[in-house]
Amino acid sequence: MRKITSFTPPSAASLEQLMKQLGCTSNQMAALAGVKDKNQWRKYTGANPMRSMSATTLFFMAAQLSLSPDEFERVLDHMRNLGADIATEALSLPSE
């Protein structure tokens, strides 16, 4: 197991670069990061960002980008075993 002991969130420019690299819209990035909508995503990427991305949000987004569908489903199954009720839908990114 690991505990994050230090975290500096990515800059707005880094997140904007990732969005361009993936060819995603703000709505797609919001879904990828597990945040409400494009308005929430834009709070992380605006010229004067209103929010810094939390470690948990960044972790969720990185997991979506790094894990295979089976690995991600395994994590969701573990969450369900812990008592969570989770429903998902496929997220299609331009690079897929």
Predicted regions and their residues:
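Short, charged recognition helix plus adjacent turn
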Residues: 68-96
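Short, basic-rich loop-to-helix N-cap that marks the start of a DNA-contacting helix
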Residues: 47-62
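Core residues of bacterial helix-turn-helix
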Residues: 22, 33-34
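Short alpha-helical "recognition helix" segments of helix-turn-helix
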Residues: 28-32
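Recognition helix of helix-turn-helix/homeodomain-like DNA-binding domains
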Residues: 34-51
